[in-house]
Structures are given as C-alpha cells and as structure tokens.
Amino acid sequence: VSAEREAAEREWTAILQADLAEYDVARTRWVRARDVVLPNLRTRADLETASYGAGRAGIMEVLDAFTALANGRLDALDKEADVARRAVRFTLIYGQDQ
C-alpha cells in the first residue's frame, strides 16, 4: 500500500509540475504579446499614419499596419484567455489554497 501511495504521489507531482510549466509558458507568451509585440505594432501603425500624412506612405501601408495591430490584439486576447483557462483549471483541480 505504501509503495502504491508513493507511486501515486510521484504521478500527481509530475502532473502538477507539467501543468505549472505549461502555465508558465502560456503566461510568458501572453506577457510578451502584451508588453512587447503590441507596443511595437502600435508604434508601426503610428509611424505609418505619420508617413501617410507626410506623403511618404500610401494608404495600403497604413491599412496593413492597422490590420497587423488588430491581429496582434486578437492574438494577445487569445493568449490571455489561455492563461485564464489554465488558472481556472488549477483552481478546479488543485483547489484555491494551492
């Protein structure tokens, strides 16, 4: 019985560690999208808009930049939702105090 219990504890520990690693990866991806990618896309959209105003860029460059920004926002939201799903999963499986 003791050996079975130890095996079960090792299995749960391995599952918990894998879940924590997956959560960390998902959170890192979300934070990077939010703090690095989105600001860069905003800057690009602002620069393309200014270039268009100065006559150095066409409307397609501006539209492409704003399309990329919109897609970046959607991607960041998807990543945030993934982190939230994983957090809920932790709460349901391991409890709130863990």
Identify what each model region corresponds to.
Residues 1-75, 79-93:
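Amphipathic alpha-helical coiled-coil segments
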Residues 96-98:
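Short, solvent-exposed mixed-charge patches
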